[in-house]
UniProtKB/Swiss-Prot annotation:
Membrane topology: Multi-pass membrane protein
Originating gene: SLD
Domain notes from UniProt: The histidine box domains may contain the active site and/or be involved in metal ion binding.
Protein name per the record: Delta 8-(E)-sphingolipid desaturase
Positions with a binding annotation for heme: 37, 60
Source species: Lachancea kluyveri (strain ATCC 58438 / CBS 3082 / BCRC 21498 / NBRC 1685 / JCM 7257 / NCYC 543 / NRRL Y-12651)
InterPro entries per UniProt: Cyt_B5-like_heme/steroid-bd, Cyt_B5-like_heme/steroid_sf, FA_desaturase_dom, Fatty_acid_desaturase
Record's catalysed reaction(s): an N-acylsphing-4-enine + 2 Fe(II)-[cytochrome b5] + O2 + 2 H(+) = a (4E,8E)-4-sphinga-4,8-dienine ceramide + 2 Fe(III)-[cytochrome b5] + 2 H2O
Amino acid sequence: MDNIISRGEIEDRIARGQAIVIYEGLVLNLEKWIKFHPGGDKAIHHMIGRDATDEMKAYHCDETVEIFRKWRIGRIDQEWENFLPPIQGGVFRFLNQQHDSTDLGLSNKWIAPNTSDQFKFIKNEKHMCGEPDVKIYPKIPQGVIPSLNLKEAYEKKVVTDPATVADNYDNELVRQDLETLPDLDPKTQEWLSKEYNKMHNEIIEAGLYQCNYFRYVKELTRIGLLFALSYYLLYHRDQKFWSAFSMGCAWQQLVFIAHDAGHISITHHYQLDNIFGMIIASWVGGLSLGWWKRNHNVHHLITNDPIHDPDIQHLPFFAVSTRLFDNIYSTYYEKFLWFDAFAKKVVPWQNYLYYPMLAFGRFNLYRLSWMHVLLGLGPRRGKAGWFRYFELCGLIFFNYWFFYLLVGCKLQTGWDRFQYIMVSHITTMLVHVQITLSHFAMSTSDLGVGEGFPMRQLRTSMDVDCPRWLDFLHGGLQFQVVHHLFPRLPRHNLRAAQPYVIEFCEKVGIKYSIYGFSKGNGVVLTKLQEIAVQAKTMLECASAMKKEATGEREADEKTYRTKSIKNA
């Protein structure tokens, strides 16, 4: 019989540095497991103090789910109200500091924190699991359930500071979300969770987790033909441009299979899928699957949060939220993302620079991949501990066959080498468009810890409407809403799962966002333009206020000099 653990004791344990997560009413202490977690430490950090039942079931197979139970230290005997995790700025108290009148549970009242030390470095030593080095306050204060009745969550403020301009814009987006989404109270979110799990069970019973391996034979055949065509055009026809283009097309298609393998959605066997994915990503594509998984796992859990989701943290080049104007501290990268002089020049024009910037996206992935492997940012222990060395060998091999043998030895002139590299890499731009298309135009609001898993995924993700015969070109990224709800679902079954999601959305009253590829790109560009306009407005406001202050000082100095002359 499991011990009953009170809310106060759980708060105390988290304050003492334990990684406490709630799963199906069980209290799990993952403090010792976190260093072995194949999905990385950040994914667990964002679930501390929360009921992560839906997330844990969505991202893990049944065998792994059973392993969770070995880490239980007791259970709860009440409906759980989520704490704000330490990594997101949560405050936790020891037992002797707790009082009934100051419970950290969810409330319908606004609790305004003193944010004067926002993003300031914490002087005392860290003691909580995942606690960042700087002080972080969420947009919605700890323990608050935002609603339309709670005007503090979205009201516009009198502009006394340039930053208020951007803050008012973000508040308006929060208001729009509160108007269109179901209530955030615990009962409504619990109902959404139950309906989501009913849908999940229907998808399981329909056999949609069974992978059609013949479809992957077709995918690999197509990719193999593209590589063969690239080789033939270069070595037998001396068609450098079209050879590079074919190479880029093959890489673009490879990314989708690596994505599937990273989610363990092909064989559903952890080691097999990861080995397959690493061969494709590192050895053939020159990218780290481990980097992508660490990044992507956090993205799935805290989708479109400007402070925590690395997939929308692209300063100084892009900003998809005005909150990024604030010199925020990224809890993923563990550093400040400065809205510096360069960003102030680029972001106001980001809707025009969007496609040119994405054309060079693959070069940035090389940088991130090498940093991940060399710095050992992935798991160093457990069943994923050896991946780092396998990927390092893969990255070296890729640089040998592509940059040395093909570019360095086969191509004779500097211009030919430059052209081949640029054409092959710019061709992969399409996949970067497809990735950003799914989320850049969607909600970036912070709606507090009361928001459940299914609602967050639906409001932050977009699907792309395309004919079945074009599914190969999008590689499953056209079903990002479905994928975010069921990350382990085989890619070729996402279309079959789509009707279940549409029916679910109609039942619970959440918009299912889907656009054609052209229309979707237009929506993204419109969002980027809106943020660009806000950046221009804020910067113009700052400039005007500075001039006004300077003008007043000059007028005061002139008056003082005049009086001094008269007195003399």
